[in-house]
C-alpha cells in the first residue's frame, strides 16, 4: 500500500514537507501589497536580539557611578575600547569590542507594560485595539505583523528560504502568549517559522527540512506533480496551493536544512558562544543568516528573563550579563570572520529599561528595579552602522533623555530600510484598509559619521 493511499492529501503534504515537532510552518494566505517601497538595501539579513523583560540600562550600558546609591546600584563601571566610555564590569568582552557597536542611550517611548512594549519592539507599531489588561492583550490576529511577516507579505520569496525564523521558543507565560510574534492581521500564511527546541540541548535536531531517508529531490518532484494533478480536479484553495509550493521548496532547500545542523560547528566555535541557550541561539542565528534567512529574532530567555523586579544584581551578575556578554562578543567576531558583519544588521534591545530608583516589592526582601520606558539603551551594529560611538544621552539619574530620542517605531523603520523596504510601504488589513507598514523614521544617525 502506498503512502498516499493511507493518508489524506494534506496530511501527506504535511508529513512529506517535514512539518515536524520543533518548527511551526507558515501557511500563506494573505494578499501581498502592491507596492513594497523598494530601495537600495544596506543589509541582507537582520538579527534582532530580544532582551525580553527589559534590561536595566543603569546596570549595564548607561551606568551612573556618581549618582546616589539608590540610583547607581551595586555594579562598578569599567573602561571600554572607546575613550571616556564606560559600561558594566560584567560586560568585559563587549567593552573590548565597543568599536564595532553604536550604543544608543536615548531609546524612549511611553509604554511601561511588557505585552504592548514587546509588540512595539517586534513590529515597530503600536498594538491595534490595545486593551486594559494583559489577558486582553495576548497574541491575536488583531496584532500588527512582525517584521518577518510583513517582509514575506511585501517581498514573497520563491527560493525555499523562509523570510523569518524566531528562536529558541515563542514568548509564552502561563495563559499569556505575548503579542507581536506573528503575522497578525496579514494572516497565518505569513507567520515566521518558530523553533521550539533549545539549540543548547544535546538532542537538538531540526529534521523538519531534511529529506526522509531514501528520498531524493527527484522523488519529491514526482510527489509534487502527483499532488498538483490531484488538486487540479477542483477549484482548490489558492492559499493552500501556495503553502504546498512553499513547503516543497523548503524541503528541497539543503541550505535551510544545513543551517540547523548546529552540531556540525567546531567545538571551539560552540564553546566560544557559550554552552547555554543564549550563546547557542546566537550561533544558530548566525547559521541562519549565512543560509540566507533575512530576519532572525533571537529571544534571550523566556518572557520575563530580564524583568528584574527582584534580585536585580544577583540575576544580572550570576547569569544574564555573562551569558549575553560572551554570546554577543562571539556573534560579532564570528559574523566578521564569516564575511557577514557588513551585510547583517544586528539590533540588541528589550522593550524598555528599569527604574532609576531601586525598590523592593511588597513581600520581597531582595531589591530590584521596575519597568521604565522613558529612557533606556540598545546596541546596533553591522551593515553600515558606524561603530565606536555613543548616540544620545540620559540625565544624571538615567530617568529621561536629554538629547534626541528614538522609539521602537524608529528601530522598526530602520530594520525595514536596512532590508530595502521603505517604512512607507503599504499593507492592508483584513478590511482592506491601507496603512504604512511602519510609522517610525529610520535612524539615519546610525550610519552617519560625525
Predicted feature descriptions by range:
Residues 1-450:
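Ligand-binding pockets and gating/stacking loops
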Amino acid at each position: 500500500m502506498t503512502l498516499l493511499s493511507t493518508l489524506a492529501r494534506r496530511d501527506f503534504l504535511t508529513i512529506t514537507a517535514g512539518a515536524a515537532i520543533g518548527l511551526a510552518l507558515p501557511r500563506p494566505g494573505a494578499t501581498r501589497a502592491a507596492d513594497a517601497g523598494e530601495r537600495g538595501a544596506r543589509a541582507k539579513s537582520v538579527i534582532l536580539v530580544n532582551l525580553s523583560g527589559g534590561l536595566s540600562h543603569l546596570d549595564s550600558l548607561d551606568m551612573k557611578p556618581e549618582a546616589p546609591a539608590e540610583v547607581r546600584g551595586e555594579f562598578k563601571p569599567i573602561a571600554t575600547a572607546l575613550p571616556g566610555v564606560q559600561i558594566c564590569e560584567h560586560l568585559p568582552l563587549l567593552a573590548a569590542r565597543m568599536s564595532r557597536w553604536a550604543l544608543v542611550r536615548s531609546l524612549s517611548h511611553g509604554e511601561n507594560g511588557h505585552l504592548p512594549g514587546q509588540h512595539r519592539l517586534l513590529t515597530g507599531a503600536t498594538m491595534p485595539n490595545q486593551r486594559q489588561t494583559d489577558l486582553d492583550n495576548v497574541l491575536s490576529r488583531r496584532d500588527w505583523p512582525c517584521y518577518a511577516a510583513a517582509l514575506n507579505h511585501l517581498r514573497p520569496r520563491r527560493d525555499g528560504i523562509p523570510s523569518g525564523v524566531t528562536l529558541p521558543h515563542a514568548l509564552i507565560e502561563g495563559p499569556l502568549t505575548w503579542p507581536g510574534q506573528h503575522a497578525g492581521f496579514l494572516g497565518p500564511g505569513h507567520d515566521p517559522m518558530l523553533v521550539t527546541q533549545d539549540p543548547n540541548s544535546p538532542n537538538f535536531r531540526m529534521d523538519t527540512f531534511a529529506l526522509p531517508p531514501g528520498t531524493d529531490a527527484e522523488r519529491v518532484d514526482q510527489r509534487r506533480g502527483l499532488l498538483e494533478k490531484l488538486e487540479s480536479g477542483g477549484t482548490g484553495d489558492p492559499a493552500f496551493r501556495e503553502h504546498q509550493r512553499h513547503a516543497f521548496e523548503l524541503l528541497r532547500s539543503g541550505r535551510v536544512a544545513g543551517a540547523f545542523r548546529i552540531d556540525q560547528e567546531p567545538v571551539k566555535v560552540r564553546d566560544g558562544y557559550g554552552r547555554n541557550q543564549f550563546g547557542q541561539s546566537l550561533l544558530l542565528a548566525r547559521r541562519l543568516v549565512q543560509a540566507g534567512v533575512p530576519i532572525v529574532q533571537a529571544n534571550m530567555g523566556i518572557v520575563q528573563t530580564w524583568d528584574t523586579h527582584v534580585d536585580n544584581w544577583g540575576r544580572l551578575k550570576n547569569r544574564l550579563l555573562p551569558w549575553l556578554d560572551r554570546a554577543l562578543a562571539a556573534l560579532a567576531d564570528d559574523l566578521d570572520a564569516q564575511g557577514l558583519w557588513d551585510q547583517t544588521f544586528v539590533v540588541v534591545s528589550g522593550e524598555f529599561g528599569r527604574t532609576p530608583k531601586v525598590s523592593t516589592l511588597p513581600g520581597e526582601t531582595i531589591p530590584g528595579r521596575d519597568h521604565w520606558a522613558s529612557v533606556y539603551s540598545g546596541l546596533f551594529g553591522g551593515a553600515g552602522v558606524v561603530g565606536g560611538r555613543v548616540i544620545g544621552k540620559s540625565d544624571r539619574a538615567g530617568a529621561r533623555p536629554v538629547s534626541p530620542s528614538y522609539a521602537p517605531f524608529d528601530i522598526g523603520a530602520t530594520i525595514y530600510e536596512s532590508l530595502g523596504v521603505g517604512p512607507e510601504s503599504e499593507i492592508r488589513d483584513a478590511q482592506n484598509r491601507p496603512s504604512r507598514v511602519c510609522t517610525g523614521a529610520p535612524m539615519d544617525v546610525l550610519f552617519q559619521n560625525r
